């Protein structure tokens, strides 16, 4: 995982998928500390690295899968004064979309998959960043908080060296009409597993 933050995605992947090797890369020391604590608290076998994701190829190469939840917002857009660590998670202060895609491509094997969450409104930017870094967008899923709402996020799957051809998956709705998680989200987060 590139830009692992406090490790939520890595923890979920480790518990649900049990990969042979899982490496979580995070640049911010304060977030890296949370990541390490999360891994230890959950008793998981996740390698953690405090480094810039652009240097990830020094720790990983030939990866089958890379996941990334990069900063969504352009530099100096919105939110006024917030903690620097939070600002770096939300805004392209330390890395932009093209840099994140380049980092993913540098560690993926040919035909490896890159999963990325980003703003739905930046679909064109995502497609351009992926293609510029030798990856082709293969699947996309719009994410809505509630059914009937306009999607704000999207989940993308790209393949390094993949051929042209995008498949749209059904929308992912996070909350049901009562405000609880939908069965799909509960399954994704392994909420009903013992």
Regions found by a protein language model. Give the residues of each.
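Conserved SAM/SAH cofactor-binding pocket of Class I
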Residues: 1-79, 102
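Short, solvent-exposed coil/turn elements at secondary-structure transition points
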Residues: 54, 143-146, 161
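Mobile active-site "lid"/loop adjacent to the S-adenosyl-L-methionine
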Residues: 70-99
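Phosphate/oxyanion-binding loops and surfaces in catalytic or ligand/nucleic-acid-binding neighborhoods
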Residues: 73, 133, 161
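SAM/dcSAM-binding transferase cores
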Residues: 150-194
């Amino acid at each position: 995982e590139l830009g692992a933050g406090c490790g939520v995605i890595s923890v979920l992947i480790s518990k649900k998928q049990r990969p042979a090797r899982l490496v979580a890369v995070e640049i911010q020391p304060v977030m890296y500390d949370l990541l390490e604590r999360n891994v230890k608290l959950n008793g998981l076998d996740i390698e953690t690295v405090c480094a810039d994701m652009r240097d990830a190829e020094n720790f990983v190469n030939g990866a089958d899968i890379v996941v990334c939840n990069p900063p969504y917002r352009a530099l100096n857009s919105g939110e006024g004064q917030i903690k620097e660590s939070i600002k770096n998670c939300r805004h392209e202060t330390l890395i932009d979309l093209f840099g994140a895609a380049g980092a993913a491509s540098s560690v993926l094997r040919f035909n490896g998959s890159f999963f990325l969450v980003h703003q739905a409104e930046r679909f064109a930017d995502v497609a351009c960043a992926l293609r510029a870094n030798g990856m082709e967008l293969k699947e996309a899923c719009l994410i809505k908080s509630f059914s009937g709402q306009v999607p704000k996020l999207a989940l993308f799957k790209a393949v390094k060296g993949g051929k042209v051809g995008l498949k749209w998956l059904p929308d992912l709705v996070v909350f049901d009409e009562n405000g609880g998680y939908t069965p799909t989200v509960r399954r994704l987060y392994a909420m009903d597993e013992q």
